[in-house]
A protein has these predicted regions:
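Beta-sheet-rich non-transmembrane sensory/scaffold domains
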Residues: 1-311
Length: 311
């Protein structure tokens, strides 16, 4: 829209095949995602459900759009479409590029999708806002995990670019770098906020241009904006295995050594309230119903022998 008048912008986009839309100022993004769709109904629900939950971002001459799966869309099924990242010319609305958040054959990261799960698994997308780095022609993209949130036995592998931070060249859509904050995510630990750009004054290194990703886990993952190298060392720590049939989790997860976590990591009996002995007893009784543990405590089967509820 023209920001002064609110009228559709002349010369931007074009006619879309839906009655009532103006002949200019509109871009049909569904056409650029590459899936069959009906102009009025969208992508068939048996294929998937796609939407946009955050505003587009303008980086120099490029508009970048992070698409996402509809929140809560049929989490009982494994099929969905991926929320690939789209880019358009900011003046004309002309399509520039698409970045596949689930790599296709021959693309970097395709080998992290075993069982040919890349063909029908979806949900990997960017529902959180993107971050612009106009000086370096970079857009930083935070992503969420694949279908389904708490089980991934049908999609063995690390599942790039799920639950990652991706730096894309805004002119070409090429991946500059990426970092996967959770491998084979079955905890719904999607990156929930726009990456933060900051300049860090580090003793012995001077001013370092950085980008930081705040996470649901209470960690902040901090990287060199240009290279993606962690500012401080990451530790690949061993995590528990899953007892759910068919599930094969990653044996390790990357943990930042700095900064320290800003939130508690998992839960144990020591974390329960003890204002009075009665409250303590009641809290323990409630906790006994749940399978609680460390940060990467695996989800459990609903029909587990202990009769507990996954936390």
């Amino acid at each position: 829209l023209d920001a002064e008048t609110g009228a559709p912008l002349e010369g931007f986009g074009g006619q879309v095949p839906v009655d009532g839309f103006p002949s200019t100022g509109v871009v049909d993004m569904l056409a650029d995602l590459g899936h069959p769709y009906d102009p009025y109904e969208g992508i068939p629900l048996e294929t998937g459900y796609i939407t946009t939950s955050s505003p587009p971002i303008v980086v120099n001459d490029t508009i970048v759009v992070g698409n996402s799966a509809e929140q809560g869309y049929l989490q009982a099924r494994v099929e969905n479409v991926p929320g690939d990242i789209l880019a358009y010319d900011k003046t004309t609305g002309e399509f520039k590029w698409k970045f596949n958040v689930i790599p296709r054959p021959g693309e970097y990261g395709h080998e992290t999708w075993e069982n040919d799960a890349w063909q029908w698994t979806g949900d990997v997308s960017s529902w959180a806002p993107l971050t612009a780095d106009p000086e370096n022609n970079i857009v930083y993209v935070p992503t969420n995990p694949p279908t389904i949130d708490y089980y991934g036995g049908f999609r063995p592998g690390d599942n790039l670019f799920g639950t990652s931070v991706i730096a894309l060249d805004t002119e070409t859509g090429e991946r500059r770098w990426h970092y996967q904050t959770v491998k084979h995510d079955v905890w719904n630990y999607d990156n929930p906020a726009a990456p933060i750009q900051l300049d860090l004054n580090i003793p012995g290194r001077g001013i370092v241009p950085a980008v930081a990703q705040v996470t649901k886990q209470g960690y902040v993952y901090t990287f060199d904006r240009m290279t993606g190298e962690p500012i401080w060392p990451m530790e690949d720590r061993a995590v528990p295995a899953s007892e759910v049939p068919g599930e094969k989790l990653s044996t390790t997860q990357p943990i930042p050594t700095k900064p320290p976590p800003f939130e508690m990591q998992g839960i144990s009996e020591e974390d329960l309230i003890d204002f009075t002995p009665q409250l303590r007893r009641e809290a323990l009784e409630v906790m006994a119903n749940y399978d609680m543990g460390p940060l990467f405590n695996p989800p459990i089967h609903a029909a587990n022998e202990a009769g507990k509820i996954s936390s």
